[in-house]
Amino acid sequence: MSFARLDIAQAKSSVIMPGLSHQTSSQTSPGTAFLYQRGLSFMELPASLQSLQIRTAAVVEAEIAPRAAQVDQTAQWPAHSMNALGEAGLLGVMVPVAFGGHAQGLLGLSVITEAIGRACPSSALCFGMHCVGTAVIAAKATEFQQERYLRAIAEGRHITTLALSEHGSGAHFYVPQTRIEDTGQHFLVDGTKQFVTNGGHADSYVVSTVASSNSDAGDFSCLIVDSDSPGLNWLDPWLGFGMRGNSSRALHLDRVQVRHENLLGEEGDQVWYAFEVVAPFFLMAMAGTYLGLAQAALDATAEHLRARRYAHSGESLRDIESMQVRYSEMWMAVEKTRALIREAGRRGDMNHPEALPFILSCKADAGDTVVRVTNEAMTLCGGAAYRENSRIGQMLRDARAAHIMSPTTDLLKLWTGRSLLGLPLL
């Protein structure tokens, strides 16, 4: 898979469905039981990924799911989730095996974020962004970066994330305004980043910068900025409509000193990072997160349709034909999205020449699906779902973030169309 068709220079499943009557076997292990209960398929996945999927499900069941409502209600960054994932050795899923990680790719990232997202989307978002940051560091890591960052990540001792978005460039994350100056001894970084996931909680931040005002679009540098660097100033917390556990904050960098060893790749060539690493891994992480959320809404709807009965007839909602039809449409939407995401991951990991439109479209499709399915879940579950602080209400709020997070759904559909028609994306 290559994003070379972006042409920057010229541009300047099989699934185990719970259904309406599925019952979980009492013979399954805790982690496996959670997979079955949540309709999570591990068929046709590599054995190593199946193992990680089951391990993730066990962490979700024991540590993440029980506190998911609290995360939303208190707008609390899910430290317990990240700690539990670290203790289970899952923070290093993107780290090469040589440094203690699991060397997963796009498919693995989407599968693991799906497993987390069906219980706590905020936790999946925070974990996913850590994984994207890790992938960026690992892509061309020097020996110094391997030892200082990748080993610590694999050992569960280090959380990283991206700091790319800016107010001035909006959804165009690949056109930073933050600047660096090389003093000869170190870099000085000046600028303000917006919507930094894990803001104030990560141990390091992958920051994009542009060297000068006359630099071309796409001509920028990426650096690793340690969280304890003098000159890092966090602005007021941002409380979202949904994904309330995400500490998405603005970060002002005031002449922050960064050692030369923290430069990723060569200065000024980081458009490669933006479109060969950041974009595909971010899109797959978010697609998996929103697929998990859509599956959770599907599960909750099935549970309600089975349980809700009319006293005068004894009939349950699942016995009503219109409910059966509408539920089947929800199920079909989720399965189509899962199939697209799995195919995108496989093609991307194989470096398939036609992977690009699959990867570009998977987050857009997951966004459309999760908004549609959570909205339909609200309708089918009625007053029970519409009450304050209901789980489906939270799902509906969380789902809306899918269309807003950069690259937006409309932008991804535009890029997909241009890719399919042989046009440069930008």
Residue ranges of predicted features:
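A short core secondary-structure module
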Residues: 192-234
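Glycine-rich phosphate/pyrophosphate-binding beta-alpha loops
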Residues: 194-199, 279-285, 402-405
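C-terminal helix-coil-helix/basic helical segment that borders enzyme active sites and/or dimer interfaces
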Residues: 65-72, 335-365, 378-386
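Extreme N-terminal basic, low-complexity initiation segments
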Residues: 1-13
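Amphipathic, small/basic residue-rich leader segments at the start of a protein or domain
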Residues: 3, 16-25, 29-127
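Glycine-rich phosphate/cofactor-binding loops in nucleotide/flavin-utilizing enzymes
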Residues: 381-426
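Glycine-rich flavin
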Residues: 76-87, 91-197
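Glycine-rich beta->alpha junctions and the first turn(s) of the following alpha-helix
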Residues: 239-334
